[in-house]
Amino acid sequence: MRQLKITKQVTNRDTPSLDKYLHEIGKVELITADEEVELAKRIREGDQKALNKLINANLRFVVSVSKQYQNQGLSLPDLINEGNLGLIKAAQRFDETRGFKFISYAVWWIRQSILQALAEQARIVRLPLNKIGSINKINKTLSTLEQQFEREPSAEEVAAELECSPKDIKESLKNSGRHVSMDAPLSSSEDGTLYDVLDSKDSPT
């Protein structure tokens, strides 16, 4: 069976129509719990094909979760796009040694990604146009740097790219409902991240 290639670009607006997308993911074979374990091991070793397979097999679940958040400010395709981002993060972080199924872990990331997007949309519609322009510019830079670094950039890295202060970046992200990456370095000279500083009891690791 031809595998549907899923990467971060799945969230771009030039994806196929929703009906075609749903048809494509409906053809992807589901995987067993044992296969999840094997894929997780391969993902930790840097196997991109294993990552794609784990993501592909769970795309239908993202659609189901996304439907629960309709009529709250985002279209169903946009909700699915955001949910897919959460699914990708879950697949990259999944630890099979903890003994639970992948989807039980992934649902938290899927919902958080959708909820953050809904919160961002709700805040943006209340912002002045000049601030919306700044936020859009920052978001584009965030996306570009994320592809370049293969991780979410820090506020300092975004500020350096846009030639402004990290404080301005953080304030704009706060206004839009987005947050600085928990995984990004605290600064260019430090290896620690916010995950190292905070006791993250409310999120899976």
Would you name each region that the model predicts?
Residues F94, V125-L127, M182, V197-L198:
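Short clusters of hydrophobic/aromatic residues that line enzyme substrate/ligand-binding pockets
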Residues R2-R126, G133-Q148, S203-P204:
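Alpha-helical promoter-recognition and RNA polymerase-docking modules of transcription initiation factors
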Residues N12-L22, A119, G133-T205:
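Charged, low-cysteine interdomain linkers and short loop/connector segments
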